[in-house]
């Protein structure tokens, strides 16, 4: 793995984990929880696997319209940007 990929994967996980303690609506909570689990798993993966799993996280986060909490929405926006960046094929 290149140095930037593991760091970005860690930051992605941290952004999603930060939503766990916030008052988020039920549907968003389920999707954020799934995305967090995938992000947690991908932290120890090879670059090609990170790209694939980041795409899964990106797709899960795309289904979240709003969280019902402004702080969680900010974490969601940062997580979306990180997942989008990590899902780019040049990270393979």
Question: Predicted segment positions?
Answer:
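Acidic, polar-rich N-terminal leader regions of halophilic archaeal proteins
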Residues: 1-92
